[in-house]
């Protein structure tokens, strides 16, 4: 579990996070949602220690991130898995080598054991057949699954995902959502997902935190989203749904244009 208590953060006198209080629950998919520029990314960066808040506490199962020394912070980061907006795979490495990378960096196991662990993670995301391929030889969805395999290679307690469905079609996005959720439950991790995708919210949003202009406006479950009378949240949902429909039309138009040519 991760607890955020009274977090504030300002840049050049402008408040970006304003007294944020939130609990990210263990074994659940915790989603931070909001418009671009709302403070979601800054909040994530503070939580993982890439930024330091001006005030407040960030507790990892009771351990205070802000008071940690460099060695303690490095040890904590080894308990974190990261899934970035792009796949962030190394082009010069095979899929298997990409998944082995964090193991080669931080694990003291033998090469044989590290390779076995990487192969297990690839099997878990249904990519065993692609382990000897390079990123340029696989699809965007497969690259995302490879990135998930790499993120769980060190058996993390905490998983952080930044817009994991960015650039994916709706069907593939659904598969990635389900995979992240299932792995969260299996590993009993605390998973924090930064997204503005309402499909993800309604699919796997077990604990949802809505941020607007640096303020936590609302927190609840996907079931409570439907019945919420929070105007800011409802406006965000409407805008997100409209943007999704426009994107679907553009994708359909693009497919039709390609067929015509």
How does the language model describe each region?
Residues 48:
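Helix-to-loop junction immediately C-terminal to a conserved catalytic motif
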Residues 56-64:
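Conserved ABC transporter NBD signature motif
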Residues 170-172:
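Helix N-cap at the start of a conserved alpha-helix in ABC-type nucleotide-binding domains
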Residues 223-261:
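C-terminal boundary and immediately downstream tail of ABC-type ATPase nucleotide-binding domains
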């Amino acid at each position: 579990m991760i607890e955020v208590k009274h977090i504030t953060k300002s840049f050049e006198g402008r408040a970006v996070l304003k007294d944020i209080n939130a609990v990210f629950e263990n074994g659940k998919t915790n989603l931070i949602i909001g418009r671009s520029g709302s403070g979601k990314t800054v909040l994530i960066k503070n939580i993982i220690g890439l930024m330091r808040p001006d005030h407040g506490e960030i507790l990892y199962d009771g351990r205070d991130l802000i008071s940690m020394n460099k060695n303690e912070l490095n040890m904590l980061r080894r308990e974190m898995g990261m899934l970035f907006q792009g796949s962030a795979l190394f082009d010069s490495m095979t899929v298997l080598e990409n998944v082995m990378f964090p193991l080669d960096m931080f694990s003291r196991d033998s090469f044989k054991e590290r390779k076995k662990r990487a192969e297990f993670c690839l099997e878990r995301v249904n990519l065993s057949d692609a382990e000897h391929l390079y990123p340029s030889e696989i699809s965007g969805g497969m690259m995302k699954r490879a990135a998930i395999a790499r993120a769980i290679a060190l058996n993390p307690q905490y998983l952080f995902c930044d817009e994991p469905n960015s650039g994916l079609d709706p069907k593939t996005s659904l598969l990635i959502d389900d995979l992240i959720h299932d792995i969260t439950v299996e590993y009993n991790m605390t998973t924090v997902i930064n997204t503005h995708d309402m499909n993800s919210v309604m699919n796997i949003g077990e604990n949802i935190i809505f941020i607007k202009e640096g303020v936590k406006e609302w927190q609840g479950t996907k079931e409570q989203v439907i019945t919420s009378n929070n105007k800011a949240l409802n406006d965000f949902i409407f805008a997100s749904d409209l943007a999704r429909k426009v994107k679907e039309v553009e994708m359909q138009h693009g497919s039709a244009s390609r067929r015509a040519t």
